[in-house]
């Protein structure tokens, strides 16, 4: 390891691992729901559409994702600290890819939690079919909006893989 401060490196890794735990807890809140035979897709689930899923859970999911994303940043710092200083372009690419990963994770947490909230809120109020249509339309509209977040990361990684940036 090339880092001058191994205790700080370990500290950053621990903070990043805790951040991953927060993000996993948010995912667990969304994923651990009772399933029915009629459930299909991510949000066409009776538990959401009946209003049984607590409206506070998607809000907590976003909060856990935000805290997790913030703490995961320390893993990005730890990985960056281990790259030799003479490889400055590589360090920059790795750092930017790490930041884009955190931004994408937080965006996806927010997006998925919002759809769960919409399904839970709208299901009992406007009916199951209308709620499914609304959530599906939201999902279809948001996916193209999220995809550009991946472009800088792919471009940076493609440049790094090409060898010119090392």
Predicted segments, located by residue:
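Hydrophobic, aromatic-enriched alpha-helical segments typical of multi-pass transmembrane helices
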Residues: 2-166
